[in-house]
Design a protein with these regions (language model features):
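Binuclear metal-ion centers of metallo-dependent hydrolases, dominated by the metallo-beta-lactamase
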Residues: 67, 111-190
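A general structural motif
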Residues: 84-88, 105-112, 135-138
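Short, hydrophobic beta-strand segments that form beta-sheet elements in well-ordered domains
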Residues: 102-105, 156-158
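Binuclear metal-dependent hydrolase catalytic cores
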Residues: 1-104, 116, 170-190
Length: 190
């Protein structure tokens, strides 16, 4: 799932090659139209094999559109994913709703048409880059305001900049809110 075309969300694409070579099959990747165009422009070798290359393509690019659910097949049952649009500076990034979980990694605003996707959540993973304003990311206070407004059972703040100390932030957060950490596992109800 690609949320948008920025480098911090796309430049790990080459790290998928060993997985594909091990599995001996391409991986399905999902992106909206603008992100897909950007991926093809920068990483076309991941989707097609140039005539001079012995490396196979590694990804099948599948379309995503805000407001249109898609079933993602895997080893178990298909997972129903609902992409929805988010303001991220000058662009629209995607957030994802999967059952009772919402993932909104890069945003500085939530359009009215995306509010329903954030209702009745068990878990909301939400961007909070830093304490001071940023043109394309929520601050900690903005994230907490939205958490208070939408009332998920649990919220996890992610995408924190290096100037946010994990322990200090966690000590200040409401009981149902915590800071994310590398290796964190989230168990969903049901």
């Amino acid at each position: 799932m690609f949320t948008h075309e920025h480098a911090d969300h796309t430049h790990g694409i080459d790290d998928l090659r060993p997985l594909v070579l091990h599995q001996r099959r391409r991986i399905d990747a999902y992106a909206d139209e603008l992100t897909a165009a950007s991926l093809h422009a920068r990483f076309d070798y991941c989707f097609t094999s140039p005539a001079s290359s012995s490396y196979p393509p590694i990804l099948n690019l599948r379309p995503l559109a805000a407001g249109t659910s898609v079933a993602i097949a895997g080893q178990g049952e298909a997972i129903e994913l609902l992409p929805f649009g988010l303001a991220h500076g000058e662009i629209v990034a995607l957030g994802f709703r999967i059952g009772g979980l919402a993932y909104t990694p890069d945003l500085n605003g939530i359009p009215d048409e995306s509010l329903d996707a954030l209702s009745g959540l068990d878990v909301w993973i939400i961007d909070a880059l830093r304490y001071t304003p940023h043109p394309s990311h929520f601050t900690v206070d903005q994230a907490l305001e939205w958490i208070a407004r939408k009332k998920p059972r649990r919220a996890i703040i992610t995408n924190m900049h290096v100037d946010i100390d994990y322990a200090t932030l966690n000590a200040k957060l409401p009981p149902n809110v915590e800071a994310a950490f590398d290796g964190m596992q989230i168990v969903l109800p049901g």
